[in-house]
């Protein structure tokens, strides 16, 4: 790990990593960014706790606290880590994370499977519209395949038989909550539930549009908000910024 790391971005799934790249490339012009990615083998179990343990092993290489950030399930990992290891985290930025952090798109998918007698493929196609908005049919098919793989790779142990929950509440370090006004997974109402545990130095912001992956569609808008938040936390841009990636497996 570099000694001048500013921001560590947490990714929960290799297959969704592509949707983080525009934002990370944009902010890497001003701050030094590393991407930590959780991976597990199909024949092995996975969990948020294991992801946090692996992240802690990686963060043990860093002698100072960093600004931690993540989207959706990646944000849930970042939040869980920040609560367990607060001295390792300078600030926490969560994108499309509900106040109940386990309420990701995976939970919505399994809830629909419980409620409706339609096929897995139909529900995934509906989920594509919820996450990305209306897309051409060929794009929808590709995104259905992406989501199908993400269901297998998620560290959240949702299933048709049980939806898991994670602890709710805030954190000790400065916190930024970001969402999108037209995200049906983490709606504006759901996002406002964070207000009950925000501190004076915390910040809640909504992108005007962009659905669940608003940071993919509007990387500059989202990036500017994050950069402003980090600079308020006394983060000084490095003379030479960069983007690196780290992959950890269980």
Curated annotation (Swiss-Prot):
A UniProt-annotated Pfam family:
Thioesterase
Q: Which Gene3D superfamilies match?
A: alpha/beta hydrolase
Gene Ontology biological process: biosynthetic process
Family per similarity comment: To Synechocystis PCC 6803 sll0249.
Protein name (record): Uncharacterized protein alr2406
To which species is this protein native? Nostoc sp. (strain PCC 7120 / SAG 25.82 / UTEX 2576)
